[in-house]
């Protein structure tokens, strides 16, 4: 059987890092098993769901190098949900209820006051037809009837054996009074219809899983394998759209590389060290869903920021060729020169400026004679990365300066700054004429 997973965001906001982690782990899991990946938009909330959010979610996943085999919108499947809803209603596994929100709140408070679990008391099931007729003017909503005699259990790939006493679970609302569906039933119907075999999601869905297992059973369908990830926390707050967790837009504002983000989320929550990679496919080979632990996982944006230069340092020219072409850079020499010295990709713009012909050299008065001498012994012939070694040897024959007192004045004269990448790689980029101009510069 082909493994099939799904990532099911609600297009009611931008992706936050908790979503991204779930999507990545789900994607890595199925790709590591040569499976298929469904992108499902849970947009049954027609008022809050927006096309702009849906497009941004898809674009963010592409930016993170995740692809999908097909996608679906729940809003296109209401007829199918109605079909299954009516079947379960006929089978008396779904039943109508008539309480107002205020009445339900009052019942819940009374149960808590009496020390009882705050679950629905099923009073709607005890109504006579006459009583139902009395409520005919009320808005009706519907619940799925839990089999409360069951012990609901499953083998979770992260949490091991998980069990719920169904007697302590409230019958979930599956259809609201306004006729819209809640998350529960459409999700199960989609998982059945699209042959979902494995579901990866946050531990905040564990109680939903217990309920949905009964829905799978009620529809005589195979129950998928579940993996419940520990939640991400930032400053002791659970990350969510409502808390205001970092979105991909925030990460892009920080100019973080996609693979800094992916390398981080592929390993936090496991005991494995975080190793940076430049391609998402490289993360597939070491992926193991069982390595994720149950402890709360702390997210720290500073840790991702620290990974960013490491990713850039490992990127080859081919990895950034398209982005460099947008800056009119077509030769690999400049990237080879600066890649080990940038914190974010945009830093290269400063090095383009430095390597251009408008840079003003810095030659201290105390170094002027030294720079003149250095220019006089600059090697003839083709300039390559060996030129620097020869040049330094020539200089050392003419001066008793220590290496530091040689390198810093030369760097200032050639770049205008006191730190930076290897000068050996800079010389071929500048060329003889520009080197002579800079070393011979006078105010």
Swiss-Prot record:
Its main location: cytoplasm. GO terms for cellular component: cytoplasm. The keyword Nuclease does not apply. It holds the Pfam family tRNA-synt_1c. Keywords: Aminoacyl-tRNA synthetase, ATP-binding, Cytoplasm, Ligase, Nucleotide-binding, Protein biosynthesis. Its EC number is 6.1.1.17. Belongs to the class-I aminoacyl-tRNA synthetase family. Glutamate--tRNA ligase type 1 subfamily. Catalyzes the attachment of glutamate to tRNA(Glu) in a two-step reaction: glutamate is first activated by ATP to form Glu-AMP and then transferred to the acceptor end of tRNA(Glu). This is Glutamate--tRNA ligase 1. The gene is gltX1.
């Amino acid at each position: 059987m082909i493994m099939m997973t799904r990532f099911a965001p609600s297009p009611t906001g931008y992706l936050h890092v908790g979503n991204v982690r779930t999507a990545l782990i789900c994607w890595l899991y199925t790709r590591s098993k040569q499976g298929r990946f469904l992108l499902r938009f849970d947009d049954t909330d027609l008022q809050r769901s927006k096309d702009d959010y849906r497009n941004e979610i898809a674009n963010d996943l592409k930016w993170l190098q995740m692809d999908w085999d097909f996608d679906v919108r729940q809003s296109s499947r209401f007829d199918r949900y109605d079909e299954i809803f009516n079947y379960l209603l006929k089978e008396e596994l779904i039943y109508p209820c008539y309480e107002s929100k205020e009445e339900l709140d009052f019942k819940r408070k009374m149960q808590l006051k009496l020390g009882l679990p705050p679950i629905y008391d099923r009073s709607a099931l005890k109504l006579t037809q006459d009583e139902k007729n009395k409520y005919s003017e009320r808005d009706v909503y519907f619940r799925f009837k839990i089999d409360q005699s069951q012990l609901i259990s499953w083998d979770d790939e992260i949490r091991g054996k998980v069990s719920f006493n169904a007697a302590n679970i409230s019958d979930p609302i599956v259809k609201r009074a306004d006729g819209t569906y809640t998350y529960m039933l459409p999700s199960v119907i989609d998982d059945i219809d699209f042959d979902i075999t494995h579901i990866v999601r946050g531990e905040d869905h564990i109680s939903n899983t217990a309920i949905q297992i009964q829905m799978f059973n009620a529809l005589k369908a195979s129950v998928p394998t579940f993996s419940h990830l520990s939640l991400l926390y930032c400053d002791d707050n659970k990350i969510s759209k409502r808390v205001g967790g970092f979105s991909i837009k925030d990460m892009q504002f920080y100019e973080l590389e996609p693979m800094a983000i992916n390398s981080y989320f592929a390993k936090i929550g496991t005991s494995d060290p975080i190793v940076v990679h430049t391609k998402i496919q490289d993360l597939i080979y070491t992926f193991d869903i069982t390595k994720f632990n149950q402890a709360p996982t702390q997210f720290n944006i500073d840790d991702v920021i620290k990974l960013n230069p490491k990713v850039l340092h490992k990127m080859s020219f081919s990895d950034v060729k398209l982005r460099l072409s947008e800056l009119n850079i077509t030769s690999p020499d400049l990237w080879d020169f600066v890649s080990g010295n940038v914190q974010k990709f945009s830093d290269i713009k400063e090095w383009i400026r430095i390597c251009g012909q408008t840079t003003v050299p810095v030659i201290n008065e105390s170094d002027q004679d030294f720079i003149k001498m250095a220019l006089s012994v600059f090697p003839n012939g083709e300039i390559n990365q060996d030129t620097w070694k020869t040049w330094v040897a020539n200089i050392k024959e003419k001066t008793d300066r220590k290496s530091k007192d040689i390198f810093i004045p030369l760097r200032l004269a050639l770049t205008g700054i006191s730190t930076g990448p290897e000068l050996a790689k800079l010389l071929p980029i500048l060329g003889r004429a520009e080197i002579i101009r800079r070393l011979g510069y006078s105010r």
